[in-house]
Amino acid sequence: KDLEKEFGLTLFKRKNNVLTLTQHGKYLYDLSMPLIQEYNNVNERMNDYINKHSTLNLGIPPMLGTFLFPPIFNVFANENPGFQFKIKEYGSFANKKAVLDGEIDIAFTVTNECEVGDELEYIKIGETSLIFAVNKNNPLASKKVISANDIKNTPLILMKEDSLQYQIITSLFKEQNITPNILLTSNQFYIIKELLQSSDNNCGAFIFKQLIKDGENIIGIQFEKELKLDVLICYKKDAKLLSTTKRFIEFIKNNI
């Protein structure tokens, strides 16, 4: 009413306690939106300035974070001094749930299918694939390609059930009516790598191809069905993103 009095125009239609914009009101609304957006931007920037340290709650699958996150962190931290990350190491499925629950702002994740959903926004940032890894002295190390039948008796180390890797591998065995010999499930990639490095056991694990390094005792073998995956970041769709989250998303879009 104050605005209507000030401008001498009817801005709202009032009927049964419901307000709708008149043509004059719609015009004022359109004029005001850029000002409101700019105010929100100023407010966010001032909050960052006052807090000095910006914090981003980030979810990363343990194995993916081993090779993907360090170079991203190094460049972003240099460009954004005072920026802080709080990292949660969850599997891909748990990461998505944590974003939806508001526990984390952004998650890195992997998928073997096109991700479309009503609740999460996805940005593809790369590709990888799972390969079978064994110690170089393992009898299987000489193989160029391997099948589920070849490793049906091999003690397997898998990530935990909340990971896409676990779901993919157990499904592959199930399709061929083979029960995998799961020795251990762990989200600690350091443990998995140490077990593979040791020649005292004949265990194997499915790991990302980028984790096979020259000079190590671990050999990577292509699985008969190529296990290609897309690497993504995801965040809550239609949510009011903090400036810290927006800044990181823009960095990923422009640099990855």
PLM feature segments, named:
Residues 91-92, 98-103, 110, 164-219:
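Hydrophobic hinge/microswitch elements
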